[in-house]
């Protein structure tokens, strides 16, 4: 059985440490547990890393589209690898959760996240799994809008705590991945 794990993020060096790229950062941590590297796949609108485990194949996907067009890459990978919607896990930032909190579940809404909205629209289904990683809200929403906040870099202290945060996330999804 093949499973897709898709990290939501924006391509480009200027976005590497932004809150919106937490999905890419999480995938980097997950990928470090396996041997291999991400390969560019223009036809899939992403880079990917294919991992064979005793429980099946896991394909890690980093879309090369921007966040709002994530569904295009998800659909291309779904078709190419022959994965069911239920075999897809999307890793995304969540401003409605405190920094460091996690939610893992299936059949849920987008919660205002444009990448998840687009994915649901393109797949015509919300039956995929979501790992929502809390990034918090702007401390002063009147002076810093949500878009500016998710495109801002993590603070020094937040960056220091990402590994522990991601370890919790990996532990949460391990049964779904089959290890």
Swiss-Prot record:
Alphabetically, the GO molecular function entries are: peptidyl-tRNA hydrolase activity; tRNA binding
Catalytic reaction list = an N-acyl-L-alpha-aminoacyl-tRNA + H2O = an N-acyl-L-amino acid + a tRNA + H(+)
Which biological process annotations from GO are given for this protein? protein quality control for misfolded or incompletely synthesized proteins; rescue of stalled ribosome
Q: Keywords for this entry?
A: Cytoplasm, Hydrolase, RNA-binding, tRNA-binding
Please tell me one Gene Ontology term that the record gives under cellular component. cytoplasm
Q: Which SUPFAM superfamilies match?
A: Peptidyl-tRNA hydrolase-like
Q: List the disulfide bonds.
A: none
Which Pfam families does the UniProt record give? Pept_tRNA_hydro (PF01195)
Q: Where does tRNA bind?
A: 15, 66, 68, 114
Q: What class of enzyme is it?
A: hydrolase
* Enzyme Commission number(s) of this protein: 3.1.1.29
Q: Where is this site: Discriminates between blocked and unblocked aminoacyl-tRNA?
A: 10
Q: Where in the cell is it found?
A: Cytoplasm
Q: Which CDD domains match?
A: PTH
Give the highest taxon in the source lineage: Bacteria
Q: What residues does the record give for site: Stabilizes the basic form of H active site to accept a proton?
A: 93
The primary site where this protein sits is: cytoplasm
UniProt-annotated catalytic positions: 20 (proton acceptor)
Q: What does this protein do?
A: Hydrolyzes ribosome-free peptidyl-tRNAs (with 1 or more amino acids incorporated), which drop off the ribosome during protein synthesis, or as a result of ribosome stalling.
HAMAP family hit by this protein? Pept_tRNA_hydro_bact
Q: Which NCBIfam families does the record cross-reference, listed alphabetically?
A: pth (TIGR00447)
Q: Which PANTHER family match?
A: PEPTIDYL-TRNA HYDROLASE
Family, according to the entry, reads as follows: Belongs to the PTH family.
How it assembles, according to the record, is: Monomer.
What is the name of this protein? Peptidyl-tRNA hydrolase
Species whose genome carries this gene = Chlamydia muridarum (strain MoPn / Nigg)
């Amino acid at each position: 059985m093949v499973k897709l794990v898709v990290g939501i993020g924006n391509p480009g060096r200027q976005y590497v440490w932004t809150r919106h790229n937490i999905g890419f950062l999480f995938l980097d941590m997950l990928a470090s547990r396996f041997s291999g590297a991400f390969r560019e796949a223009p036809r899939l609108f992403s880079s990917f890393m294919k991992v064979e485990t005793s429980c099946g194949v896991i394909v890690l996907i980093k879309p090369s589209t921007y966040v709002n067009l994530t569904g295009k890459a998800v659909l291309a990978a779904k078709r190419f690898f022959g994965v069911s919607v239920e075999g897809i896990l999307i890793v995304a930032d969540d401003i409605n959760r405190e920094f460091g909190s996690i939610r893992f579940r299936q059949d849920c809404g987008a919660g205002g996240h444009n990448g998840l909205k687009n994915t649901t629209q393109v797949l015509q289904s919300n039956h995929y799994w979501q790992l929502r990683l809390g990034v918090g809200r702007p401390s002063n929403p009147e002076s810093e809008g949500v878009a500016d906040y998710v495109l801002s870099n993590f603070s020094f202290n937040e960056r220091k705590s990402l590994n522990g945060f991601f370890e919790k996330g990996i532990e949460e999804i391990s049964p779904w991945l089959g290890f």
